[in-house]
Structure formats: C-alpha cells, structure tokens
Amino acid sequence: MVKALQGAAQNLPADVNQLIDQLERHCLAPDGSLVTKSVYSDLQLAREEMSRERLRYLEAMAIYCEAVAMVEEYQQAISVANHGGIRDVQGLYPQLGLKNSPQVYETLEHRLVVAEAAQKLRLPLISDGGEIHEEEIEKWSILSRSSLDSASTSFTISSTSNSVNYANSSANSVAGGISLSAVDTDVVGGVPNRFLGITPAYLSYVQLQNTISMDMADYQMFLAREIEGRLKEKCDKLADAIVDDTDSSTGNRNSSARLPERVKFIIEEIERDEAALREDLYSADRKFAEYYNVLEQILGVLIKLVKDLKLEHQHKYNEMQKTWLCKRCETMNAKLRVLENVLLLETYTPDSISALHNIRNYLVEATEEASAAYNKAVTRLREYQGVDPHFDTIARQYHDIVKKLENMQWTIHQVEMDLKSHD
C-alpha cells in the first residue's frame, strides 16, 4: 500500500509529498502497515504475549494429555488383569509403558477427577500450600450463582485458566478442590454450585480427606520422570520422522536436541515455497490480465468486422430470401386455386349433375325420415316417463332379460344340435 502511495505521490505537489515523507519517518510504523508507531509497538507486545501464552498452553496441554494417557493405560492394565485372571498386574506395566507403582496412578487419577470437577464447577484450585483464598472463593461463588447452567458453558475465561493451571500443576501434583457451602435453592438452570450432584463442600471434603500414603516429593518426582520420559520418547520419534538424509546417513543419535533447529529450518523452507508460489500466482494473474486485454481487443476487431462487412451483405441476402419466399407463396396459392377449379370442373359434369341431384334428394329424404323417427321415439319416451318415473330402469332390466333369453335360446339350440348329431 505504501508503494501505491509512493506511485501516486509522483502526481502530488511537493509540500504534500514532504508531509507524507515526514509522516512515514516520524509517525508511521516501519513495516508499511500505515499504523502509528505506538499502535505498532503495542501490537508487537501483544503478539509476543500471545506467543508466550500459546507456548505455555501447549506445554500444559502436553503434560495434561500425558497424564490422562497414563491413567488410561493403568486402567487398561487393570481391565486386562481382571478379565484374564492375571494376579501379577505389575507385569503388564512394562508392556503398556508404565513405570511406577499403582499408588502413583491412583493418586493421579483422583487428582484429575477432582480438578476436572472443580473446573466444571468453575471453582479456583487450592494453592500450593493447601490454603484457600476467601476472596477468590467469594468471587467465583458469585459467578457460579449467577449462571443458569454451570455444566453447559464450561469454555469460559475462568474454565480456560483453570484448565491451564491444572495442566501445569498435574506434573507437580497440586491438589484440586475447595471448600464452599452448597446452595440447594432451585433456579431456572438447576441447582447452582452443582455438577452431576457434586457440591463444592463435598469436593473439598474428598480432596482433603483422601491423602496418599507416600511422600509428596517422591510422588512428584516419579510422576515428573515418567511424563518427561514419555515426552522425550515422542520427541525422538518426531525427530526421526523429519530427519533429513544427511543426518540419517551420519547416524546422528542426538536427534531430539536438534529438533527445534530442524523444525525451524522446515518452517523457513515452507515459507520460502509459499512465497515462491505466491509470486507465481501473482505472475499468472498478471499474464492472465494481459491475455484478457488482448482477447478484448481481438473481440472488438471481430465485432467491427461483422458489423461493417458481413452484416451489410447479410441484410441484402435476407431481403432477397424474403422476396423469393413471398413469390413462392404466391405461386403455391395460384397452383391451389388451379387445382380447386380443376376439381370442380371434373366433379360437376353434365352427366353427373342429375345423379348428384338424386343423391341429394335421397339424403334429404333419409334425413327427414330419421328426424321423424327420432322425434317419435323421444315423444314416446317422454310419455312412458310421464306414466312411470322408473321407466328407464324398467327398460334397462327388460333389455337385460331379452339378452339373457337370447343367450338361453342359443344354448338350447346348440344342445339340440349336439343331441341330433349323437342320434
């Protein structure tokens, strides 16, 4: 856009160009986005903060996913042992990648359940020292009471912060629960401060009562080591998947250490490819615009040729064709009149006129007799209908009886003929 302004500035006065240069030098951002320097610096800070937040979120989500996967694999081992009657459950741990005792996984599962329930209740987590801040409790309690449905809209700012805080604290085994008095007053969206029948007071009681028998430091160390090992294994697999031919030929084993460099190199290569493709696209667009302009010019020339040359001759040809068709129609009309006169001449000869008169008289007499018979029949029918309104029904029944009688007579005649043939 700055280049466009610079191109347009060539036609502007000198004082306007000087003003634009001063604005670009002292007020506008150096990237050509046409925003002020203060806004540009705030935007850069916001982008850096968003990048850091995204990095923290991804780290927390990776730890949380590994913790959930550990609990699922532990439950899978227990299920296989129960169905298969295996007494040595710990023998299945190495096959599933589990390296700690059942107490660690049970404690982790318990803390996951409590933390997720606290998140659904929109409650703050217990602090590192086990203390509960009354100010935060009151704030979140007011937010929870004002909600109509505490279970349907869990993706809010509070639930997001709780999930991030919990995912960060899952490796450090920070307990999740709080002590609140349950409010049992029904509202439109259900009972507030409840989720599937779980109240804050019950959640706090479960969290504070269920303490593990092992040392907290050992629990945190075991959990952190296993999560670190699982993440490192996945990083090694990812590095092996994207390693180039040079590294694979030299047999470099320290692939996880160079993973960020490889990822950065691949990202830069993809960005270069995208820039090249974008440049090709712009070049293709420019060529297409040029081709389109040439085609428009060619089309204009063709239209001019058609209008100036071909259409003029076409109009003359159409006029001649119309005249020829009109003459042909007149000729056909004359031929039809001739055929009509010939037909009349051949039909009305001196010999056939007397015969035609006789035929006409016969047809007139036959028409009069038929009309008289029809009128007589109509008159008699009306007389019969006047005598009996059901005459039509009786006549139809009589007709049916006569047909049946004729059929019976024909059948009797056939039987008599068969008997005579047998005699």
Swiss-Prot record:
Keywords: Cell cycle, Cell division, Coiled coil, Cytoplasm, Cytoskeleton, Microtubule, Mitosis. Disruption phenotype: Lethal when homozygous. GO terms for molecular function: microtubule minus-end binding. It is found in: Cytoplasm, Cytoskeleton, Spindle; Cytoplasm, Cytoskeleton, Phragmoplast. GO terms for biological process: cell division; spindle assembly. The keyword Manganese does not apply. Involved in microtubules reorganization during spindle and phragmoplast development. This is AUGMIN subunit 4. It comes from Arabidopsis thaliana. The gene is AUG4.
